[in-house]
Amino acid sequence: MDHLIQFWPILKRLIIYAIPWKKKIILAFFLLLSGATSEVLGPILISYFINNILSQHQLNFQLILIIIVIFIMLQILAVFFNYFQSILFNKIAVGIVNKLRNDVMKAALNQPISEFDSQPIGQMISKVTNDTEVIKELYDTVGPTFFRSITLIIIILFAMFTLEWHMAIITIFIIPLVIIVMSIYQYYSTPLLRNVRYYVANINNKFNETINGMNVIQQFRQQTRFENNIKESSELHYLARMKILKLDGFLLRPLLSLLSALVLCSFMFLFSYFSIGVYEVGVLYAFITYLGRLNEPLISITIQQSILQQAIVAGERIFSLIDSPKQKYGNNEEEIKSGKINIKNLSFKYKESGENILNNINIYIPSKSFVAFVGQTGSGKSTLANLLMGYYPIKHGKIYLDDKSINCISHDVLRKNILMVQQDPIVLADTFSSNITLGKKISEEKIWNVLKTVHLSSLVQSMPKGIYSILGEEGNNLSLGQKQLLAIARILVRNPKILILDEATANIDSGTEKLIQTTLSSIRAKTTLVVIAHRLSTVIEADMIVVLKKGKIVELGTHKQLLEKKGFYWKMYNFQLFNC
């Protein structure tokens, strides 16, 4: 019964998003009411014509002309009002969904990094795009259709009771039956629609995985396997949709049509008990017409029930993201001035049930020193770098920056003073300038100075538009080494107090590595430099080298001191030296 409990809270939250548009919504409902009233008045005119003109065999052409003109005017007004209310509701829907999509994106941007470790990217993309588009139909289709249908039902029933209350009472019995049908539909459709939304997100995730890994897929001839995976996901989505369609086909239009037919038979049965006069023929015509008109909004409401359920399920997925815990930071706005780091009794694991990645790490890094962390894959080097960046909450032990606990420092101060260059740099499909500034106001002179520092100025000068030259998707017109240098330029223009390089030279050629080493040498006097290194040749000049093994510090010292010990570092260095 959980899906029934969640229906109203989610619908209420979705309705709250419409409050800023209340003036336009009121105007749209006025147009909707006017259009519905214009539609309903038509059969009353025809009934009047049959009962008062046709039955009397006295053709008053002037009155007939007036009735015809009024009837045509009512139809024109109905079209006019319905057109403009449709345009207005669509405009409102787009505005609401734009706000909702912005909120979803804001929530995604403030998710803890740990969420991206466990959540497939396709699921996140589906929430931002597909689910918000489904919710759009709630505002531009379900809402207007529902209120238009309710308005029509009320006006039609009022007209029916005005004409003949016996027959109107029979008609009203169809409404509780419709409510029962809608309740049954909601009960059975919600879990099916959840499956549909899940399979859509799963297909998006597999497409994302396939496109991003296309080089590897083609290299290892895995096209057939990935094609079959996507086919399997599509088949599951198809089967889930078919279950919904079968439910729609049974509970929606066909069942309501049957109910309407039963009501019509009741009309005929009741009509047979009265003397058959022309007046009764006019009434019967009006009731048959109204029954057809009544059938349309009832069917519309039940059909919209399917779209409403899809919107509720999509809303459930979206609000689960919006309501999820955000990355927590401290409130201390005091700037980091020296850049010294003190790590005390630090232990860390990604999952509560998992094993420790880091175990009782203790180290002091002086201001403006060059410290390297080395070790085999899985030793905890990158985890330590992520903790220094404040990406994960620290529960066991402490990291102090300028004698302040990292858990107490504000997000703005952390991001301003501690920056990282990663192994796989992110390059935007934008200009050199935009990739360096990232929206921050920085002078052209400063951009050119930092490009000279990272030895990219000659490359940029050779391009037609210089720093305003557009880079390709993910910077595909740059080499990996050039991307890495650009990433370093992006960091240097901000003058961080602490600079972390996480395997920044692991995948580049020796020439680019030398350029990076030269760049780092030029900034050593300005910042605390923390290097996570795979190639030991890149950290020979470090003031201190920390050797990690299975999350523990096993050795500590300068390059010369560690070689003299002939321990774990000595073995690693000689292995790389003689196997290069």
UniProtKB/Swiss-Prot annotation:
Binding site for ATP: G375, Q376, T377, G378, S379, G380, K381, S382
GO cellular component: plasma membrane
InterPro entries from the UniProt entry: AAA+_ATPase, ABC1_TM_dom, ABC1_TM_sf, ABC_transporter-like_ATP-bd, ABC_transporter-like_CS, P-loop_NTPase, Type_1_exporter
Keywords annotated in UniProt: ATP-binding, Cell membrane, Membrane, Nucleotide-binding, Translocase, Transmembrane, Transmembrane helix, Transport
GO molecular function: ABC-type oligopeptide transporter activity; ABC-type xenobiotic transporter activity; ATP binding; ATP hydrolysis activity
Keyword Hydrolase appears in the UniProt entry: no
Ranges where the ABC transporter domain occurs: 341-575
Catalytic activity field: ATP + H2O + xenobioticSide 1 = ADP + phosphate + xenobioticSide 2
Localization terms from the record: Cell membrane
Residue ranges of the TM segments: 26-46, 61-81, 142-162, 165-185, 258-278
All residue ranges annotated as the ABC transmembrane type-1 domain in the record: 25-310
EC identifiers of the protein: 7.6.2.2
Any Pfam family: ABC_membrane
SMART domains: AAA
Principal cellular location given in the protein's record: membrane
UniProt membrane topology term: Multi-pass membrane protein
Keyword Transport: yes
Family: Belongs to the ABC transporter superfamily. Drug exporter-2 (TC 3.A.1.117) family.
Name recorded for this polypeptide: Multidrug resistance-like ATP-binding protein MdlB
Gene that encodes the chain: mdlB
